[in-house]
Amino acid sequence: GQAQRIKVACVGNSVTYGYGIENRETNCYPAQLQQMLGDAYEVANFGHSGATLLNKGYRPYTQQEAYQKALRFAGDYVIIHLGLNDTDPRAWPNYRDDFVRDYLSLIESFRKANPRCKVWVCRMTPISHRHPRFKSGTRDWYWMEQALIEEIARIAGATLVDLQEGLYDRPDLLPDALHPNAEGAGILARTVYGALTGDYGGLQLPAIYSDRMVLQRDQP
């Protein structure tokens, strides 16, 4: 019989969905990731534009159909990239104390759906200073969130993936200051591919390992 394909759930907001990308179905980061991983994997896009991580945000991910579909999919690998929409005056100032708890309960819900699943938590893609909201406090909130996301990965025993690094000095790949174009989505796909497989393909990105992982490579 045919071996079971490894199911990869890409959970997120408009960046995962592929908002603004030409030929989104083939060029969004989950679709490009599918191309890289090949037939042994089934990658599914559960991105929802405008979704907040915060359950009291203005568009909570956990209240979207994409979330219910992701739970039913019960991915073996779950990649979560949320938080950009929480850097909003409607969300962060009022509800930031819920961020860690809401994130941990989201992770837990995927582990309930598939107790064997592995979870990757993503540092957020950049918001360019050209973004209209950037000066309102969003910039400071963004960095507060990045630090919390690192903490969340540690507490949850999930692996951290840095989606900021590859796009940080490439504002040209963020035409509207927030959403990556197809080339930018390709960088995200390569970064996630590296995190899932340990193969960074010559892409010099810092590999960030969770406390639970032991690096064998440097052992004598």
List the predicted regions and their residue ranges.
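Non-catalytic, glycine-rich low-complexity segments
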Residues: 201-220
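Conserved SGNH/GDSL esterase-like catalytic core that processes O-acyl groups on lipids
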Residues: 5-9, 15-104, 140
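Alpha-helical cap/lid subdomain in secreted, periplasmic
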Residues: 61-198
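Residue-level detector of flexible, active-site-proximal loop/helix-junction positions
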Residues: 15, 50, 126, 167, ...
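Low-complexity, Pro/Thr/Ser/Gly/Ala-rich linker/spacer regions in secreted
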Residues: 1-4, 194-204
